[in-house]
Structure formats: C-alpha cells, structure tokens
Amino acid sequence: MTFYLLRQRLLLLFLCLLFPVVLSAGNASSLNVVILGDSNTWLGGEYCTGQQGWTRWFVDRFRPATCRSYARSGATWTHTAATRHDLRENTERLSDNNVVFNQIERLIDDCNKGRQIEPQLIIISAGTNDAWFPKQRAEVLSCSVAQAFEEPDSIFSHRTPETVRSLAEVVRYDCTLLMRIFPHAQIVLLTPMQSTAIPDLRLFAVAETIAQCGDQLSLSVVRQDKESCVSSARERTARCFTTDGTHTNIEGARRNGYYLANRISSVLQW
C-alpha cells in the first residue's frame, strides 16, 4: 500500500470516529437547556456568561439554542424540617430554602408565566454543600437509596418538602417532580467535584448516592468526583484549577465546561 493510500484511509477513519461527536454537538443547536445547582454553577451567572463558571464554557462548546441557570451559591439537594416552597429567597448562603427543589419551583413558575422556554435538557450539578455541611444537613445520609425508593410513587409524590430530608429521598423527589412537569425533557445529574474542604470519603458517599439514584430513575449521571480536572490531592499541594480548593478558577471552569459538553453530548437523546 502506498503512503498516499494509507494516509487517505487514516483520514477516513479519523472522520468516521469524529462524525458521531460532531453530529451529537450539532443536535444541541435546537435544544433549550436549563441548569440547576450550587456555587460552581452559579459562578457562570444566570445566562452562563461568567468565565469562572463551567456553564460559560459548556455553552461555548455545546452551543444550545438557549441556556439558563437557576443555580444558587450555597444550595443543597437535601432539605430540613423548615424547608418550604419559596420562589422569592435569593441568598448566596446555606439556608433552609436554598435547595434544588426551590430552583425547580422557580423554573416551573417561569415556564407557566412565559418567562422561560420549556427545556429539553435539564442538568443538575449539586451535592458539594450536602457533603460540606453535615451539621446543617444532618440527615443527608440517613436513608439508603433502597429505602428511599420503597414507597410507591403515588404516595411519595404527595409528600411535602420538609418531610423529605435525606439525600436519596430528595434526589428521587426532585427528579420525579421534573419528570412529571417536563415529561419530554432529558435530565442529567452531575455528582460534585472533589474539594479540599471535604473529606474524600464523605464526598464520595454523597456522589455515590446521587449516582445510584440516577440509576434507579434511568437518568444519565456524570461522575465529576471521578472524572473532572479538580483533584483534592493536587489542590492541597497547589491551586491548579480552583481558587480555594472548591471553586473553579477560569482555567478549571474552562476545562470542566468543555469536558461536560463532551460528556453530555455523548449521552444526548435528542
């Protein structure tokens, strides 16, 4: 085989391997995306333009029709005995009502009032604060995933927010709510990235709970705790991709945003 023919075949093979990725990214151009989460998502701003947030770089590569973030700094999945439906609170700190559930409620309210296009893709990136603040979220790991899915949907769906306090229960509660209201939307769960502020075993326990809930609900899960550029061991030695061991700097946000665009493109169902 001549060098010319070999080069042509290698080029053809490369294009064949590249085509599914390009096709997947192209499909995103018609998608309206909504992102829920905590501070690393909130850093990108409501319309995903902040360079220190991964969402800005995600949009740059994923190129959806629209992308809006409802994330809040300090947000958790888990609830407390005082958690209530709350559309108004806008704090950047841990609080009873600064939870993913209320981000969902704001999304639903905005869609009902014509302020937000119904999303085809919903991404939820949370869990850092659930692992970080065990005293304020004491019941985070109080229930196993198996226990959280024992109650029939017909009963579980009627529970009120303050009665759903463990991480496993809340992930089920929030995701099934989204599935009822937006039945055609694809939901992707992102586990939290590693952090120097959180013992690795505790963070991994939170991430594993989220991942197992995703499996139970047949949702795609991206394991940021295992795959992202942020390593707690490396950040303890020197700040490479974070400003403080938890929150991404611009380079960390860029790498993570591009990585998430590629990973989510690979599981896109549209």
PLM regions and their residue ranges:
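N-terminal secretory signal peptides that target proteins for export/translocation
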Residues: 1-7
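Conserved SGNH/GDSL esterase-like catalytic core that processes O-acyl groups on lipids
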Residues: 30-34, 40-150, 156-157, 169, ...
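Active-site segments of SGNH/GDSL-like serine hydrolases
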Residues: 125-129, 172-207
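A general structural detector for well-ordered alpha-helical segments in enzyme core domains, enriched
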Residues: 54, 103, 167-170, 174, ...
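Boundary at the C-terminal end of the N-terminal hydrophobic targeting segment
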Residues: 24-30
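Short hydrophobic segments within beta-strands
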Residues: 36-37, 190
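Catalytic His-Asp segment of secreted/periplasmic serine-dependent ester chemistry enzymes
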Residues: 46, 82-87, 192-270
